[in-house]
Amino acid sequence: MKLSVVILNYNVRYFLELCLKSVEAAFKNIEAEIIVVDNYSTDESCSMVKTLFPKVKLIQKKENWGFSKGNNIGVVEAKGEYICILNPDTVIAEDTFENILAFADLQDNLGIIGCRLIDGKGRFLPESKRNVPTPMVSIKKIFGNSTDYYATQLNQHETGKVDILVGAFMLIKRELYNTVKGFDEDYFMYGEDVDLSYRVIKMGLDNIYFGNTTVIHYKGESTLKDIKYAKRFYQAMKIFYKKHFRNYGLFDLLVWIGSKVMPFFMSGNLEKTQKAKAYVLISERAIQTLRGFTKPLSVIQKIETYEKGTEYIFDNNSLSFKQIMRQIDGFPENSESTFKILPKNSNFILGSNSSKTRGEVVFLKDN
């Protein structure tokens, strides 16, 4: 088997459904499997997987083990040559795995491969490629200076070596994952991807950012970035520095102080979301509306012009995931547009209008 996709889920039933549909669509020419580890969700995630995706291997836990342990549990069951660690609030294109695996097979000193992530509004997520967060770099980031935190030396569309990749999408050989013993389970949430990336480059292997493939990451859906995030960030960095840096005490104190200040910076920088002025469905089907959608809706087959303040709904019943992502990615950043996807054979649309807030699910009648 070539690939095992491991998805750790916690209470994101509808985002998980969309994610799984996109992953299955990307398996056309690949011998692959999907493993979903559920961290004791209280929604209908598990029943949905059993009903709609019977081929998916579902591992149901009786408590929330956190990101590291949950993913490690999934990898134990994996059979693929490669492992893809994938967040449940992501959407991939039909050729994502085909392209990235072809590239991976050509590398002779491969560590981990990451790819270009965009949020629900089509904006590039800079954490897709990062530098090692040394104590000083982290302190600068906490106080608003991210220049050295992100790997800006590499353009978002380029491919090249970087230090740190993001846990929302990581491709790694299963043999290497097992050699480094996977994610460090001392981390509950945040920091585990930094730690894994750092351990791999310390082995002399190359972590590579693959800018030719784009994945939507509805960042903020699983956890809100607030005071809890600040505390977890501090705890994660404390573990990382204690493990990898000597004489970290002073930096530990500074990071702790910064983590107390961070929520005030974040609360002042929260993105303002505006209500859409118009709603447009892009579909090649012969339909006039979406049953159960309560707002005025126009239907078009193709976007000819970008209308500011419009919410565009993409119909996955007639458009491929790659087509949808290309159109979202093609919007200018100042378009003030928002986007949602109607998954194939589903009665809901979903999306996220901000990378700092929870995603939104809108329920429909059967269409």
Predicted regions and their residues:
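Conserved donor NDP-sugar-binding/catalytic core segment of glycosyltransferases
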Residues: 91-127
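Active-site-adjacent helix/loop segment of glycosyltransferases
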Residues: 198, 202-203, 207-272
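Short aromatic/hydrophobic "clamp" motif used to bind/position activated sugar donors
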Residues: 83
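Short, flexible, basic/aromatic active-site loop/helix in glycosyltransferases
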Residues: 132-162
